[in-house]
């Protein structure tokens, strides 16, 4: 990488700051009215004087918590990505925007999982995601006519300038705040679009269709084991009804026999003595879920080559084994509840509601083993098709099993983990997870999937 001379670098930042100042005046009147020294005058002085910026310790620091930052950034990123992807007719381009969205959500999840203090979590998430988002926006503007690209260019220029200005944020008082993100989003969103930082867990059929997932999954049937134990915010949500505009692709169909099996398993909290009956029944449900998902994905134009059908089916069974020991519920402190990890993954397939918000009904993920299984199978199909196969993971060592290993690595850790299983230097905990999964996958491949019974210990957690 060629480094700019110091003077040239300062000039670049100065131009970026000047551009952002212009955009602030046009698009961020609230910021322009703030009392106190003009931060851009401070920038100009710093650039003229040279040397390192001196932080203004009198200026209060932002007070956005990690949780607030994760939700605010997710809301912003989702609205911008959804708008940008909707401007493109290229399915591959849309998948790149989905990659940006999922990566940004995993950034938020990692932020929440870490105990390390982060002084400005919203700024951290902006810096992590902008370098992924900006190139995709820039490429999209080249594919659109000038009028359609105009608002995206405005967002790009403002975002790039804000990114450059972060080098001086302590000195000039230009933190990444919720209001900053609102004004950036409003550069591209239509008038009357509402608060671009509004965050909820409701199902969004538009989001599913935009990224090739098709209509919402069949409605969840909450387990009678839970009674009223689910939080009120997760109560039955009927936003899954498919509007006429979304009825064209074929939904995932569940035959009556499989539906009856799912209802039976959904009201079953197995003990060790139940395993000879419970495990074969769950195997049937998982196999039928994999087969139905395979067919449904084909019907919406997301097919995978037939030679990978068996691999995919084995992948679904082994992932459910790895994630939950084929269970949806456990009894904890005398109360039946969905299996949930420390960072919020839930149910049979340990699906993250935060990562997949908008794609799935959260109450269904928590309260219906069949719904959770269908969601996990759909996510695995996406990662197998659009990541492991698309990026030719099997070609590295010539081993088709690497497709399963790569798919699970992404399922477990997010898009940035695709090839972690073959990296010589890897965190010990991730290496252990990948090794554990491979053992289970190979057992399923050899027809030994009922060995899942060995992990039933009566404990309250899946692992």
What are these regions (language model features)?
Residues 314-316, 345-348, 370, 408:
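Extracellular structured ligand-interaction cores
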Residues 335-362, 372-382:
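Substrate-binding/active-site groove segments that recognize
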Residues 365-367:
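Short pre-active-site segment immediately N-terminal to the catalytic Zn-binding motif
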Residues 3-342, 378-379, 384-401, 415-463:
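Cell-wall glycan-active module
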């Amino acid at each position: 990488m060629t480094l700019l001379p110091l003077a040239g670098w300062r000039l670049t930042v100065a131009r970026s700051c000047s551009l952002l100042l212009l955009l602030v005046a046009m698009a961020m009147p609230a910021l322009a009215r703030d009392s106190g020294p003009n931060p851009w005058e401070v920038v100009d002085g710093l650039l003229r004087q040279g040397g390192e910026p001196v932080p203004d310790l009198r200026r209060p620091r932002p007070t956005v918590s990690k949780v607030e930052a994760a939700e605010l950034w997710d809301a912003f990123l989702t609205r911008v990505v959804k708008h940008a992807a909707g401007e493109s007719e290229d399915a591959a381009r849309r998948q790149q925007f989905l990659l940006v969205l999922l990566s940004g959500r995993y950034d938020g999840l990692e932020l929440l999982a870490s105990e390390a203090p982060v002084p400005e979590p919203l700024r951290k998430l902006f810096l992590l995601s902008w370098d992924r988002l900006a190139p995709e926006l820039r490429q999209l503007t080249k594919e659109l006519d000038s009028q359609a690209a105009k608002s995206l260019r405005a967002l790009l220029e403002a975002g790039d300038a804000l990114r450059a200005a972060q080098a001086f944020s302590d000195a000039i008082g230009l933190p990444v705040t919720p209001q900053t993100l609102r004004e950036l989003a409003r550069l591209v969103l239509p008038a009357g679009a509402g608060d671009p930082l509004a965050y909820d867990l409701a199902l969004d059929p538009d989001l599913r269709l935009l990224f090739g997932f098709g209509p919402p999954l069949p409605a969840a049937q909450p387990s009678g084991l839970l009674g009223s134990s689910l939080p009120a915010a997760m109560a039955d949500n009927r936003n899954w009804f498919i509007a006429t505009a979304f009825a064209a692709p074929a939904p995932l169909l569940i035959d009556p026999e499989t539906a009856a099996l799912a209802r039976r398993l959904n009201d079953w909290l197995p003990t060790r003595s139940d395993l000879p009956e419970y495990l074969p029944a769950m195997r049937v449900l998982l196999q039928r879920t994999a087969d139905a998902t395979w067919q449904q994905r084909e019907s919406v134009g997301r097919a995978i080559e037939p030679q990978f059908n068996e691999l995919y089916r084995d992948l679904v069974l082994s992932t459910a084994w790895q994630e939950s020991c084929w269970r949806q519920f456990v009894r904890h402190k005398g109360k039946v509840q969905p299996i949930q990890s420390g960072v919020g993954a839930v149910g049979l397939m340990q699906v993250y509601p935060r990562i997949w918000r908008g794609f799935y009904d959260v109450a269904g993920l928590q309260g219906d083993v069949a719904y959770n299984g269908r969601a996990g199978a759909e996510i695995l199909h996406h990662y197998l098709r659009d990541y492991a196969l698309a990026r030719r993971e099997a070609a590295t060592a010539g081993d088709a099993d690497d497709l399963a290993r790569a798919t699970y690595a992404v399922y477990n850790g997010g898009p940035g983990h695709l090839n972690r299983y073959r990296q010589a230097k890897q965190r010990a905990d991730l290496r252990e997870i990948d090794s554990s999964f491979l053992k289970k996958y190979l057992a399923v491949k050899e027809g030994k999937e009922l060995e899942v019974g060995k992990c039933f210990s009566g404990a309250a957690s899946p692992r």
